Amino acid sequence: MIWNHGKMILEALLLASPEPLTIKRIAEVIGLDERDAALLMADLQKDYEAPHRGLAIREMAGGYVLTTRPEAAEYVERLLQPKSRGLSHAALETLAIIAYRQPITKAEIENVRGVKVDRALETLLERGLIEDKGRKEAPGRPILYGTTAEFLRYFGLRELSELPPVEIDTSEPGLIVPTRTGGGEAEREVQASLFAGGEEPSAEAADGGAGESTHGEEE
């Protein structure tokens, strides 16, 4: 295969794929061994590092995706406004607890949050950000929840170890704070998303994350 033709095909695959492309999958589709597929990807990544390019190739969730460059984010946001429905504060807080304490049961999440999390869990399951990780060996064998590959993709992470360090204060229900700020680009993005407080109350109601905490329900 002519090398430039291979890069053209790889570029098309990255654009068309609904999920991060692994080197193994690229090799299978194009008909290369994995070593050559990795070299092809590295070469294409260099092409996208040129300052005039509006797109970049990022490694996340065990594969590669084609994304817009951070420098163009302001203009992309203008194009896409009004923004697609985001996650409510209740859903984000629940997701943060699951991400840092997984695998974890519903009762354990509610113990940390101090409110019921039924609707938040339903929202996160529908979005594919969390999944059933099995059953806990305890009375009633409750479901254990954990994050998914979609969670990594949603926050632009390669692996869970890139999550920013936090403290979950069980003495004050719902208190989850970063232990430090800054870090790499991915870490800053996750901090901004998980700890920014979510959408306004009207948006929370829209995605099933609203409720009255005074009645022991989701916020």
Swiss-Prot record:
It comes from the Bacteria. Keywords: Cell cycle, Cell division, Chromosome partition, Cytoplasm. It is found in: Cytoplasm. Residues 196-207 have a biased composition (Low complexity). Residues 193-219 are annotated as: Disordered. One of its GO terms (biological process) is cell division. Belongs to the ScpB family. Homodimer. Homodimerization may be required to stabilize the binding of ScpA to the Smc head domains. Component of a cohesin-like complex composed of ScpA, ScpB and the Smc homodimer, in which ScpA and ScpB bind to the head domain of Smc. The presence of the three proteins is required for the association of the complex with DNA. Participates in chromosomal partition during cell division. May act via the formation of a condensin-like complex containing Smc and ScpA that pull DNA away from mid-cell into both cell halves. This is Segregation and condensation protein B. The lineage of its organism: Bacteria, Bacillati, Bacillota, Clostridia, Eubacteriales.
